[in-house]
């Protein structure tokens, strides 16, 4: 693991942009932050859309994310899992 891996973090703003780019779902970052414990379905993002986000992040960071990332139900859970994986390099 390199020191750079420790600096990787997906923000709410990045997640909002990924939702728009990979799934065509527009959610304002402020709203996403305020409702981070609401289900992805509340924002119109389905499991296929989440899979696209996971694939984009794996490509961006060059590592496989935990399988559970594809099954996260809320943005808060997703960001916690993904950022934990990026921090440890798993």
Swiss-Prot record:
The keyword Cytoplasm does not apply. Keywords: Phosphopantetheine, Phosphoprotein. 4'-phosphopantetheine is transferred from CoA to a specific serine of the apo-ACP-like protein. InterPro entries: ACP-like_sf, PP-bd_ACP, Ppantetheine_attach_site. The modification O-(pantetheine 4'-phosphoryl)serine is found at residue 47. The keyword Ribonucleoprotein does not apply. Residues 9-90 form the Carrier domain. It comes from the Bacteria. Involved in developmentally regulated synthesis of a compound biosynthetically related to polyketide antibiotics which is essential for spore color in Streptomyces coelicolor. This is Probable acyl carrier protein. It comes from Streptomyces coelicolor (strain ATCC BAA-471 / A3(2) / M145).
